[in-house]
């Protein structure tokens, strides 16, 4: 294990020697500037003075990359990793097996991504070319494995999986993702630090491991079709892209068949889509994979003859907007409200048929004047009826007197009065 130069009296004297890679299997490549990564991540430097005391622990960490053959296949084509504002995980997954640790000692396992060179790239004529000088880099986040710190026995039995490491191009990121520049080449580095406390990381012994086949170029969309094909073939979440030709047609038939079963299935049962069983520690929506395109359903041909359906479940049809009912004239209001004044009923009916006349009923003054007119009209009608009755009673005696003075006509020139008048 190597000592932290910040723990020495003259750390600048060790800077020329930091260009040499750390020995051991899988090591080498860029200098292990773990200290500067810690400073950028916000770790305070350790105390300057004498080197830390030897704790007497003897270990020789060794790291082996899982799926190394797959990484080599990608490296031959030029590995690309998609970066997004919301963060994207890397594929192939960066998983390692660790050995040579002290079983009882505590260890931190960390990773950072550093620029592989000082160039900017472009994809032209099916190959990557240097397009100019690299853009300034944002401060990199030192990703600490969630299981840290753990005993050496834990790391040697479980290994380390960095599937939760996310890449982004959002310079305003607040989630702790690793910020990268598009069209730039980066190299992942793995650090094994023997330390039990996070605050002592800056002056603890460590070892850095670099695997050249994990080098990649950050992109916002895949440039090389070969890389896309490799991701589709090996990513467990991209199985939907593996069908081609007749396979696509068969997939559409299965999709329509499932849709038909969903419409004809009883209410208690629902049609479920086939599910895949990916790696338990990986997520479907966040892995570095092509976006699954939604296949459009084929237009169904309308049959010339109608057929009766035996299914009791109503089929889903297109949504039709609600329409207002046709205009109809309501019945006369005096038929329903016989005891109300006719003028009020007339105004009410006019207000219901024509809203512009509703102001007469909504205004209190108009309603009061309408009521006063109604009362005045009712009182005048009562007075007219009373005067008519008095005039009829006054005319009746005169009619009787006239009837007394009228003599009935004689029958045959002889009347009973004539007999009584004679002696």
From Swiss-Prot:
Segments for region (Disordered): 238-324, 384-423
Domain of life assignment: Eukaryota
GO BP field: cell fate specification; locomotion; muscle cell fate specification; nematode larval development; nematode pharyngeal muscle development; neuron apoptotic process; neuron migration; olfactory behavior
Biased composition (Low complexity): 302-317
UniProt-recorded Gene Ontology molecular function terms: core promoter sequence-specific DNA binding; DNA-binding transcription factor activity; DNA-binding transcription factor activity, RNA polymerase II-specific; DNA-binding transcription repressor activity; enzyme binding; RNA polymerase II cis-regulatory region sequence-specific DNA binding
Biased composition (Basic and acidic residues): 394-404
A cellular-component GO term for this protein: chromatin
InterPro entries for this protein: p53-like_TF_DNA-bd_sf, T-box_DNA-bd, T-box_sf, TF_Brachyury, TF_T-box, TF_T-box_CS
Stretches with biased composition (Polar residues): 261-283
UniProt-annotated location(s): Nucleus
Keyword list, A-Z: Developmental protein, DNA-binding, Nucleus, Repressor, Transcription, Transcription regulation, Ubl conjugation
A Pfam match: T-box
PANTHER family in the record: OPTOMOTOR-BLIND PROTEIN, T-BOX PROTEIN-RELATED
Role: Involved in the transcriptional regulation of genes required for the development of pharyngeal muscles derived from the ABa lineage. Acts as a transcriptional repressor and binds to T-box binding sites in its own promoter to negatively autoregulate its own expression in neurons, seam cells and the gut in order to restrict its expression to certain tissues. May function together with the nfya-1-NF-Y complex to repress its own expression.
Name the record gives this protein: T-box protein 2
Organism: Caenorhabditis elegans
This protein's encoding gene: tbx-2
């Amino acid at each position: 294990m190597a000592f932290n130069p910040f723990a020495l009296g003259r750390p600048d004297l060790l800077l020329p020697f930091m260009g040499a890679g750390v020995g051991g299997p899988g090591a080498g490549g860029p200098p292990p500037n773990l200290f500067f990564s810690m400073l950028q991540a916000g770790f305070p430097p350790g105390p300057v003075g004498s080197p830390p005391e030897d704790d007497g622990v003897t270990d020789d960490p060794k790291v082996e990359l899982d799926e190394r053959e797959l990484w080599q296949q990608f490296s031959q084509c030029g590995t690309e990793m998609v970066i997004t504002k919301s963060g994207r995980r890397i594929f192939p997954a960066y998983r390692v097996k660790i050995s040579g640790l002290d079983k009882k000692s505590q260890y931190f396992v960390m990773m950072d991504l550093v620029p592989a060179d000082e160039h900017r790239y472009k994809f032209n004529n099916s190959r990557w070319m240097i397009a100019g000088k690299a853009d300034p880099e944002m401060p990199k986040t030192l990703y600490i494995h969630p299981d840290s710190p753990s005993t050496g026995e834990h790391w040697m039995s479980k290994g380390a999986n960095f599937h939760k490491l996310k890449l982004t191009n959002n310079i305003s990121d607040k989630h702790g993702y690793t910020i990268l520049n598009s069209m730039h080449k980066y190299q992942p580095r793995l650090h094994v630090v023997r330390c039990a406390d996070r605050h002592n990381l800056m002056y603890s012994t460590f070892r850095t491991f670099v695997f050249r086949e994990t080098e990649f170029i950050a992109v916002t969309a895949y440039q090389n079709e070969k890389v896309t094909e490799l991701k589709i073939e090996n990513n467990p979440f991209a199985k939907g892209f593996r069908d081609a030709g007749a396979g696509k047609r068969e997939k559409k038939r299965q999709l329509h068949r499932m849709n038909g079963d969903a419409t004809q299935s009883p209410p208690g049962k629902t049609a479920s889509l086939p599910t895949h069983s990916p790696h338990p520690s990986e997520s479907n929506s966040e892995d570095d994979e092509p976006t699954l395109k939604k296949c459009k359903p084929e237009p169904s041909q309308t049959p010339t003859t109608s057929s009766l359906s035996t299914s009791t479940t109503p089929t889903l049809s297109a949504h039709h907007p609600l329409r207002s009912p046709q205009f109809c004239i309501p019945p006369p209001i005096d038929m329903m409200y016989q005891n109300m004044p006719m003028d009020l009923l007339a105004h009410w009916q006019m207000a219901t048929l024509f809203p512009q006349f509703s102001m007469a009923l909504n205004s209190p003054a108009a309603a009061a004047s309408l009521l006063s007119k109604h009362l005045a009209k009712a009182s005048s009608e009562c007075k007219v009826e009373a005067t008519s009755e008095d005039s009829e009673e006054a005319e009746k005696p005169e009619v009787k007197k006239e009837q007394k003075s009228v003599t009935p006509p004689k029958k045959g020139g002889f009347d009973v009065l004539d007999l009584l008048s004679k002696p």
